[in-house]
Amino acid sequence: MTITHQQRRRLAMALLVLTIAVTVSRLRAQNIAPSASAALSSSVVANTDQTSTQQPGADIPPQPGPKQLTNFVEAGGDYLNLSNRFGRWVGGYGRGTVTTGNNIWNGEVNGQHEFGDAGVYMGAGDTYTFNSDWYGSLTVGSSVGGFFWPRFRTDGFINKKWMSRKQLITTFGLGYYAAKDAHRDHSFFLGSTYYFAKPWIVEEGIRFNVSNPGSVFSPAAFVAVTHGRNKQNYVTVRTGFGKEAFQLIGPTVSLSDFQSQTLSVTWRQWIGTDWGVNFVGDYYHSPFYQRGGTTLGFFREF
């Protein structure tokens, strides 16, 4: 039986809604009280961005920070316009985390319509604290539909805290990305995060990526600055820049070997003691098109 494009879109969106509902109900069943000392790092703020995380490029996927907003669910949607007749991107997402012992479990479902196709990405991971100085994380993900989503991706990171207040964190990571065509990417990441005594966090990192076929070297870097306090608000400004080995714009069509830049501003605002809104403004530039838009989500802590 042949499935039409419209039927694929409906199936993808139905799967997204169903998965979000199941995730929320399971998190409610956990009935885990939020930690009074939980704080939000720039990594977690940046992780709310919806800026083209489906393909490796100048926007490096953020890593879990040492102090995260935990035991929460969030759901929202995004709308972005593209220049040069590339259309628009529209989608919705659901994500959440639960803490059990030394583990912080996280899950994500993201349904998008891009470049005339639709699909749903699903990912899960764990951040594990080994001791007061070391913690690591591992995430895996795959997708249904959507040529622009990865067939499979995984990222692993190990982090070390330094100095008297443990205010400096260094990060080392490895990643693997399998697109739905022949492209396969292997990456190596180095980064650091510094927590100032006042409510400022500075994060930077660089990813060295090799894409095959062709062994195309495509390094990319980012810098992020966060200001704010837990249970009040956080504002993060994040910029990324570097080289993209490829970007799929169709099942058999790709842009290749070009420079791109990204800029995002994230505002996470608590409205009540355990809930609030998350707003993201995104901008992307490449020689082929520009992209700009917003993401709006609502979160609830447990």
Residue ranges and their predicted role:
Residues I32-A38, S43-G123, T127-T129, R151, ...:
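Outer-membrane beta-barrel initiation region
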Residues N71, G101-G107, S132-L138, S164-T171, ...:
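Repeated loop/turn-to-beta-strand initiation elements of outer-membrane beta-barrel proteins
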Residues L80-V90, G111-V120, S142-R153, Y177-H186, ...:
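Solvent-exposed loop/turn segments connecting transmembrane beta-strands
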Residues G96-T100, Y128, K160-W162, Y194, ...:
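Residue-level signature of outer-membrane beta-barrel architecture
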Residues V144-G146, A224-T226, N230-G276:
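Outer membrane beta-barrel transmembrane domains
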Residues K160-F246:
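Detector for outer-membrane/organellar transmembrane beta-barrel domains
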Residues V225, R291-F302:
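Outer-membrane beta-barrel "beta-signal"
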